[in-house]
Amino acid sequence: MGWHSNREFFVSWEELHRATRELARRQLPAEQYKGIIAVSRGGLVPAAIVSRELNIRVVDCVAVSSYDHTEQRDDLQVMKDVTATEDGEGFLVVDDLVDTGNTMKFLRERLPKAKFVTVYAKPSGMEMVDDFVADLAQDTWIHFPWDMHLHYIEPLAGQES
């Protein structure tokens, strides 16, 4: 059964960058971290921005999937595990969005000493992260800039019928 959204939220590259820089600012001082763990794929871009802003060069990645394009699944698939740490101590786990919280709950069990942050958070998953920048309604489908294609739109003038 497919997941249906009543609302849509479109994020531009500029908006994402601004929100992620704010997320990074909240994580200062940077010296408290040994490295960053990006949650692939959505957390890759935010993790790169956080890495740059905090001047942290050690960046690992964990690939966990709970989505199949537009449908959320209950089962999680680990496609690449973390190699930089065993318990997450001193690491900042970065993702784009916490939705149901299933992915973050799963990662918290594996990395109990890490700090977990996301750019966006929905009510069902908020308690699974330590910090986030903006909250969204649970029934909102978020469109990230890497999921969209830019195209030309005809001006309104001349389209009157």
Swiss-Prot record:
Residues bound to xanthine: D99, I142
Main location: membrane
Keyword entries, A-Z: Cell inner membrane, Cell membrane, Glycosyltransferase, Magnesium, Membrane, Metal-binding, Purine salvage, Transferase
Membrane topology: Peripheral membrane protein
Leader sequence residues: none
A biological process term (GO) from this entry: purine ribonucleoside salvage
Residues annotated to bind guanine: D99, I142
Catalytic activity: GMP + diphosphate = guanine + 5-phospho-alpha-D-ribose 1-diphosphate; XMP + diphosphate = xanthine + 5-phospho-alpha-D-ribose 1-diphosphate; IMP + diphosphate = hypoxanthine + 5-phospho-alpha-D-ribose 1-diphosphate
EC number per UniProt: 2.4.2.-, 2.4.2.22
UniProt-annotated location(s): Cell inner membrane
GO CC field: cytosol; plasma membrane
Gene Ontology molecular functions: guanine phosphoribosyltransferase activity; hypoxanthine phosphoribosyltransferase activity; magnesium ion binding; xanthine phosphoribosyltransferase activity
Pathway participation: Purine metabolism; GMP biosynthesis via salvage pathway; GMP from guanine: step 1/1; Purine metabolism; XMP biosynthesis via salvage pathway; XMP from xanthine: step 1/1
Residue sites binding GMP per the record: D99, T100, G101, N102, T103, W141, I142
Pfam family, one: Pribosyltran
Subunit annotation: Homotetramer.
Function in brief: Purine salvage pathway enzyme that catalyzes the transfer of the ribosyl-5-phosphate group from 5-phospho-alpha-D-ribose 1-diphosphate (PRPP) to the N9 position of the 6-oxopurines guanine and xanthine to form the corresponding ribonucleotides GMP (guanosine 5'-monophosphate) and XMP (xanthosine 5'-monophosphate), with the release of PPi. To a lesser extent, also acts on hypoxanthine.
NCBIfam families: PRK09177.1
Record protein name field: Xanthine-guanine phosphoribosyltransferase
Organism expressing this protein natively: Idiomarina loihiensis (strain ATCC BAA-735 / DSM 15497 / L2-TR)
